[in-house]
Design a protein with these regions (language model features):
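Active-site acidic/histidine proton-transfer and metal-coordination neighborhood
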Residues: 56-61, 72-188
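N-terminal pre-domain/capping segments
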Residues: 1-92, 102, 188
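A near-ubiquitous, low-amplitude feature marking generic local secondary-structure context
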Residues: 6, 55-59, 66, 130, ...
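A generic short-segment signal for beta-strand/edge and adjacent turn/coil regions
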Residues: 1-2, 30-34, 40, 130-132, ...
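Conserved beta-strand positions in the central sheet of alpha/beta enzyme cores
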Residues: 32, 63, 114, 163, ...
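Histidine-acidic metal/acid-base catalytic patches
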Residues: 2, 13, 17, 21-24, ...
Length: 277
């Protein structure tokens, strides 16, 4: 199998060097730098020579995971502008990492910046909850028009894509916004197979209806009842081989997105045993 496998930023590792040491020990190709961590905030990532030099010594490259709080459709323009500026600067960082991908990765695969969709707030009525983005969809979707245009300009002709990841079930208004983003070649999809399993595979119809846009996978095991994810491969209910088959067919990168070092080691061992049979 020609899939490229990487690892997430792990909370047990306090430094970049700790993550790189584990990545190389396990024979993985890349690390997904997670901007939820203080050590990987944009001002830290902009020290690109430090990150690039460390990667070259180890023979690996990076993808980037944007802050999960990122909300480019916030009704407060000050908040939205701050997040948009974060995306702009992250794209500039990613451009500095393209050479690492060219040297240690697969040039055919664009460099990925991963993002979540922010559900926004909801108002609780006596009989139901109303999502504000659904109520004010026109305002919401205008933000995505602006976001797409800005990202297209910022990325330019660089081999970089922004991949939208499923989490706990795309809302209807989010699906419409994602479909608008996917009209641009600068946007694609991340399939997090553990997230989709833990919510009863509710995102699978949408993802499979747009399977040609899949470019990135977060691979970890999970279960529906009780809902669990980020398990080591082989410890849940997911048909991992079937999901990897889709990833390979679509030429996707795969992050082994467990949350502990132990689970990551088990997952790499599972893959090695699988490939040896």
């Amino acid at each position: 199998m020609n899939l490229q496998f990487g690892m997430p930023t792990l909370i047990e590792n306090r430094t970049l060097e700790d993550n790189i040491a584990l990545c190389t020990e396990l024979g993985l190709n890349f690390i997904e730098l997670n901007m939820n961590f203080p050590e990987y905030q944009i001002d830290k990532l902009e020290n690109t020579s430090y990150f690039a030099d460390a990667a070259r010594k180890a023979g690996i490259y990076y993808t980037i995971h944007l802050d999960e709080n990122l909300n480019i459709a916030d009704f407060n323009p000050l908040v939205t502008d701050a997040y948009l500026e974060t995306v702009r600067r992250t794209i500039d960082v990613a451009k500095k990492f393209v050479d690492l991908r060219d040297t240690y990765g697969n040039r055919v695969q664009p460099l990925v910046i991963n993002m979540h969709m922010h559900h926004g707030i909801f108002i609780t009525l006596p009989d139901r909850k109303v999502q504000m983005y659904e109520r004010d969809f026109e305002t919401y979707i205008k933000s995505f028009h602006r976001f797409r245009e800005l990202c297209e300009n910022w990325i330019g002709d660089a081999p970089i894509i922004i991949c939208v990841e499923n989490t706990d079930g795309f809302k209807n208004y989010e699906q419409k916004a994602i479909e608008f983003l996917l009209e641009s070649p600068k946007f694609r999809l991340t399939w997090d197979i553990g997230h989709s399993k833990a919510v009863g595979e509710k995102d699978v119809p949408f993802l499979m209806n747009h399977h040609d846009y899949l470019a990135h996978f977060h691979i970890h095991d999970g279960s529906e009842n009780p809902p669990k994810n980020h398990l080591a491969l082989g410890e849940g209910e997911i048909d991992i081989n079937e999901r990897l088959g889709i990833a390979e067919k679509q030429n996707c990168r795969c992050v082994l997105e467990t949350k502990t070092i132990e689970a990551l080691r088990k997952s790499v061992k599972w893959l090695n045993l699988r490939d040896s049979n």
